[in-house]
Amino acid sequence: MPKRNDIKTILVIGSGPIIIGQAAEFDYAGTQACLALKEEGYRVILVNSNPATIMTDKEIADKVYIEPLTHDFIARIIRKEQPDALLPTLGGQTGLNMAIQLHESGVLQDNNVQLLGTELTSIQQAEDREMFRTLMNDLNVPVPESDIVNTVEQAFKFKEQVGYPLIVRPAFTMGGTGGGICHNDEELHEIVSNGLHYSPATQCLLEKSIAGFKEIEYEVMRDKNDNAIVVCNMENIDPVGIHTGDSIVVAPSQTLSDVEYQMLRDVSLKVIRALGIEGGCNVQLALDPHSFDYYIIEVNPRVSRSSALASKATGYPIAKLAAKIAVGLTLDEMLNPITGTSYAAFEPTLDYVISKIPRFPFDKFEKGERELGTQMKATGEVMAIGRTYEESLLKAIRSLEYGVHHLGLPNGESFDLDYIKERISHQDDERLFFIGEAIRRGTTLEEIHNMTQIDYFFLHKFQNIIDIEHQLKEHQGDLEYLKYAKDYGFSDKTIAHRFNMTEEEVYQLRMENDIKPVYKMVDTCAAEFESSTPYYYGTYETENESIVTDKEKILVLGSGPIRIGQGVEFDYATVHAVWAIQKAGYEAIIVNNNPETVSTDFSISDKLYFEPLTEEDVMNIINLEKPKGVVVQFGGQTAINLADKLAKHGVKILGTSLENLNRAEDRKEFEALLRKINVPQPQGKTATSPEEALANAAEIGYPVVVRPSYVLGGRAMEIVDNDKELENYMTQAVKASPEHPVLVDRYLTGKEIEVDAICDGETVIIPGIMEHIERAGVHSGDSIAVYPPQTLTEDELATLEDYTIKLAKGINIIGLINIQFVIAHDGVYVLEVNPRSSRTVPFLSKITDIPMAQLAMRAIIGEKLTDMGYQEGVQPYAEGVFVKAPVFSFNKLKNVDITLGPEMKSTGEVMGKDTTLEKALFKGLTGSGVEVKDHGTVLMTVSDKDKEEVVKLAQRLNEVGYKILATSGTANKLAEYDIPAEVVGKIGGENDLLTRIQNGDVQIVINTMTKGKEVERDGFQIRRTTVENGIPCLTSLDTANALTNVIESMTFTMRQM
């Protein structure tokens, strides 16, 4: 069937900012889909609010709108552009929910817009828990005993019938938002009321828990002629009860008999046929390990996290083909892009094993609740490919960058066995490592199975890994055992530990005896057809399939899994760098391990190595490919941290040299440089012990900022006000030592400014200067950034330009540099310098049309910026005002304090652009999920040091008609200035403020930190209550001020004569 030619223009909705449950996989899917539709000759219009994506580049669609993903804004775009059709299944849950709202409000009908791909009725049938259950009953497909509730009372009625444990699943949400497992009345009350709040339909499904069953997923495709195939089936190692996004997953499934595999395959295809899915779809099933009983858990009628994983696991481009199916093409008429000879209707076959392990943010949020359940908590994931299950698992573990390299924790031997078993019996993110530790201590597999319900097949594999460890210990230095361990994925580091050697010695031993990996191709067909995809994984076998060309090559290191502080922005820069390398005539090679991203799409680079980003794994590739050099400045801290390790092996680091990278990172050298070029920084000292830190602080004067050297995303950074807090920090937060000193700096309050620049060694160009709304002290990734600066004087701008040029040339940057300044009352100071690509590169590139990562890469290859037509200094400003607003995922993370500070907490970002600052801020805030209302009630409770400042704010909010609630201290202050405020009680008292928040009486909360134990706990409870109830809580008065400006611009002020 040929494609449809009754439609010309297609609107694609992206998935918005990265949050837990909706990460980079949608950038990958959206990019693929837009390109696929353009390839078929359609005009594509894209709307997405996330500037950090490849998808929002002008090359990807014919028209790109970076606007908030809300009904009103998308409706405006539809009215303006008049598209013929809308493709909603590539924007995650956000895209689906938007399509449903636009249909229900009549916008699609009024503008004659058709929905492409899966019919709306099918989407609703899959997403609405009631309709789905009815359909399954008609098909005779078993679903767990369940009930739909719209109130907490109904939930308790159902509990009377089936008892605990119960699983709560809110309708029309993703990543299990608001859901959970309940074991008692208290949990049932809390989780159901939460779930009803987060569900757009105020509807929850309660089901009898089948925790302990095997969780199996099928990724399926269907077209309009009813051709349907299974692209990939996957098995969760963790049984049902842990969200699939938080589970360790293996593909293909390992423990199903052929009968079970075919039974579940038939059910999956039966269900998508009954739903009438056109495109990709993910089916989750639960299988009883002791019988052929199964249940269907849920169906996602769209491209998902699992489909990105399935695409990378098989090489079969699901999103690309789903987009083509949506415009009428069928599976039996589209060629599989990997083989180029077989059709897309052939099911892929794997001759390898892949493991996916989620990446959690608990290294950032040590107090966060680690226990895993049906609500997702991981920010990203890694994938690894091997020829044995053990190999793929161990490669995935060392891709995580937790400092773990193996099946066990770095300090594993220090725990006693009872503690280890206690940790295994709870499902949390470290359980896998504790299982390894328990097996090492001789705990039986039966005991572990009883605690975890993990299949014996996997437990035997873990046992095998531990057995090999013991054999290595008994045969130190034995080459046979070295080879054997390599077959099962052991790293040199682990072998070195057991051999009692250094990692370097094991590496040399391998080189001398020619024990090196070969690289196998991922070809979708287990080598059945000829294939020429440049997509490889390493393994210790005999035949190497990666043919080395004689072209000059440049190797680019990717940024690994998405985590807080290192998001999709670095993948964006990686992809642009690759494009620049190819344009310059070199062969571009990528090494990365994140299955969600555009950079690991095999069609982007000349060669893709899907491997861990460790010294050993990267060196193996370099030894084979012998590139001209390696580029480290686009892969975040992951890549920068590998620079000196690779250089020791004689590898050429392209761009800013290793010694210059160190000059920017090493405190002493950096201070010397600043003195030489005459750029001031806040007074600071280094401390290697708590005593030294106290002496430093006494000299500098409080408040001081303390942090370890060499970190990204402000890990373990704090602002402290006195000796007691400093002592606390030095003893609990960090282990200071001569190798790892702690930096103690004077804390300057003032405007924070961020600048990105590109330098080729002679010329420095500055695409833009951004001003932060929050004053210094809030991490730059969590601040609202504004371009162009709104409140700086000509002198300040000139000084910033001058200092940036001096710094770039002084460090001798080749490529990108990111600098943060603070403007205090007595001038401009430099806060920090990052000699690499930064979080703001995509944002600035989009605004200014200066392809920063590409220019930086061209400079690294040796081209000159002046030859490209750029002049030194700040580039001409783009028209309009642009803001970058942070987006947080606190509703998924319990026990995490949402107060903004020097440690980064946001998972993503949105952009707002318009003609005035207020309009741009309105879009930025709306896009980030803060609903801006022109009237309502604000609750103020601020620390003593902020009481003066809050008066002005209260006055303005009062004038635009906001009602003010305040705690007694704040209310008394307001009364002095005749500002009316209703006094609310402290926690636990009469008219308690938490109850007011829970009852929905409050639209905005303004709360600033007070230090001191009891008060801190109160503040923490207030802030968490706002999160659980979905109310914006501003912990910085600067953000509150900006919000007030926006409210004033939307409304009229009422003042008496």
UniProtKB/Swiss-Prot annotation:
Chain positions recorded as ATP 2 binding sites: R707, R746, L748, E752, G777, V778, H779, S780, Q820, E832
Annotated positions binding Mn(2+) 1: Q284, E298
Stretches the record annotates as Allosteric domain: 930-1057
Binding locations of Mn(2+) 4: E832, N834
Subunit structure: Composed of two chains; the small (or glutamine) chain promotes the hydrolysis of glutamine to ammonia, which is used by the large (or ammonia) chain to synthesize carbamoyl phosphate. Tetramer of heterodimers (alpha,beta)4.
Cited PANTHER family: CARBAMOYL-PHOSPHATE SYNTHASE [AMMONIA], MITOCHONDRIAL (PTHR11405:SF53), CARBAMOYLTRANSFERASE FAMILY MEMBER (PTHR11405)
Identification of the protein by name: Carbamoyl phosphate synthase large chain
Native organism: Staphylococcus aureus (strain MW2)
